[in-house]
Amino acid sequence: MKKVVRNRIARLSPLFMATVTLTSCAGVDDNKIEDNPNIIFILADDLGYADISFLGQNKFSTPNIDKLASQGMVFTQHYSGSSVSAPSRSCLITGQHTGHTVIRGNKELPVEGQHPMPSDTYTIFKMLKDNGYKTSVFGKWGLGAPQTEGAPENQSVDEFFGYNCQRIAHNYFPYHLWHNDEKIILEGNKDKNED
């Protein structure tokens, strides 16, 4: 049975697709694992209310998202913490509005990445890890360049795969992605696009 929960946390931000998957952690006491549900949070660019088939889309189907929705909770009224992507993600993972979160713009660093979120920032990832979860992010990060304190591996994210720099995420054929702190070169995209 599908549960639809109305909540005004975050609006879907443009030019961004990230899936935050948080799963129960091994090595915690068995009772705690049973008490902790799996959490899969999908934040997608420009996704309108009726753009998913279980919410009325009839020009194409989204069977995998529909199945996830039928087995869990669906939040249908998310509002962005900011009008631009990095601050919006920062608001989402810190629970703060843009007046308090450190990331207030899409400020870029010279080589690759955005202004880093300080490593002592309390985030949903730290909160979930304190409660026996493993945390993962797949998609666009943009909250700290590689090898900075804002990189996913320094923000309590156990597994990351995707775009560290949001500018590179805007290219259809990116030259590389990141798997944790390892740069993965996409050889097939080399001649199609420049980062």
Indicate residue ranges for each PLM-predicted region.
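Sec-dependent signal peptide recognition
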Residues: 6-15
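Formylglycine-dependent sulfatase
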Residues: 2, 12, 22-195
